[in-house]
Amino acid sequence: MFDRLQDVERRFGELEGLMADPSIVNDREAYQKHSREHAELADIVDAYRRYKAVSDEIEKSRDLLEDRDPEIRELAKEEISRLKDERERLDGELQNLLTPKDPNDNKNVLVEIRAGTGGEEASLFAHDLFRMYWRYAETMGWKTEIMSSSVTGSGGFKEVIFMVYGKGAYSHLKFESGIHRVQRVPETEAQGRIHTSAVTVAVLAEAEEVELHIDPSEIKTDVFRSSGPGGQSVNTTDSAVRLTHLPTGVVVICQDEKSQLKNKNKAMKVLRARLLDRMIQDQNEKIAQNRKDQVGSGDRSGRIRTYNFPQGRVTDHRAGITLYKLESVLQGDLSELVNGLATYFQAERLKQADAS
């Protein structure tokens, strides 16, 4: 581990030199690349330097064990014990930091929420989840922007797509991808029976232009008049935009803005994120196939969480987390779930790293 840490520290120094080079500073793409790598290594280097400093202090304190004064020798023993505990803690921190990280963790994210089985009740719950993530983003100090939405007559969402802008947004929200099941009594249910509905959530890392090149000739652009609930026209100009990526068949529609240009820019951002996600999923599937292990393949087909209103319960089925604070969670209090899932998947990554 320590040979690797020395290499990381050496590379960190090289990057600091490169980022101070005027030729790199004037090359936007190169500077961004080096800056990202520098940021990824910063925490590791900081922990390693603290580890070395503590080790040096232990050695200095050991010299005091030979002191003639018994009181100084006793103080030295206590100090060494404290420093060893600190070094052990830093050792664990370094092991975690050296575990392979998701390169997308610090990126902005695109969140797609779609009503599934359950009709109108599913669309209402899609709106509940949208509000939940929106409020969580507010508590984290992140900015949000709706890219596209399809509203039902009752105020629910058939589909809503929005961006979340903020450092660490992807690392906090990426485990939300999957099927979210809700169990509750609809307001229109006279018999008081509990209905089960489902909503799908997809969380995609924002793709930067330098990461993913899209040939303009491979995109088909269609424009049309935007429509609201029930199909009524909400604009008299052809402001809605539909982009089709011909090689993959991925289609994106944006019609929320009155400006065709704004809709096209939003659609391109969504398209780029979906294509990057598709590329990542393909890579994960190849890795999983090579290992003969589907863990981490990115399969979203399974139910990941249940929201049970009669019991006031939220259960995440992957990590086995159950919380009896449903209303609080739906108001954006996701920290306990997010932290629990991060710990669970970190342990899974450590298992995979040890096995490889």
From Swiss-Prot:
<dbReference type="InterPro" id="IPR000352">
    <property type="entry name" value="Pep_chain_release_fac_I"/>
</dbReference>
<dbReference type="Pfam" id="PF00472">
    <property type="entry name" value="RF-1"/>
</dbReference>
<keyword id="KW-0963">Cytoplasm</keyword>
<dbReference type="InterPro" id="IPR045853">
    <property type="entry name" value="Pep_chain_release_fac_I_sf"/>
</dbReference>
<protein>
    <recommendedName>
        <fullName>Peptide chain release factor 1</fullName>
    </recommendedName>
</protein>
<keyword id="KW-0488">Methylation</keyword>
<dbReference type="GO" id="GO:0016149">
    <property type="term" value="F:translation release factor activity, codon specific"/>
</dbReference>
<dbReference type="InterPro" id="IPR004373">
    <property type="entry name" value="RF-1"/>
</dbReference>
<keyword id="KW-0648">Protein biosynthesis</keyword>
<dbReference type="Pfam" id="PF03462">
    <property type="entry name" value="PCRF"/>
</dbReference>
<dbReference type="InterPro" id="IPR050057">
    <property type="entry name" value="Prokaryotic/Mito_RF"/>
</dbReference>
<feature type="modified residue" description="N5-methylglutamine">
    <location>
        <position position="232"/>
    </location>
</feature>
<comment type="similarity">
    <text>Belongs to the prokaryotic/mitochondrial release factor family.</text>
</comment>
<dbReference type="GO" id="GO:0005737">
    <property type="term" value="C:cytoplasm"/>
</dbReference>
<feature type="region of interest" description="Disordered">
    <location>
        <begin position="286"/>
        <end position="307"/>
    </location>
</feature>
<comment type="function">
    <text>Peptide chain release factor 1 directs the termination of translation in response to the peptide chain termination codons UAG and UAA.</text>
</comment>
<dbReference type="InterPro" id="IPR005139">
    <property type="entry name" value="PCRF"/>
</dbReference>
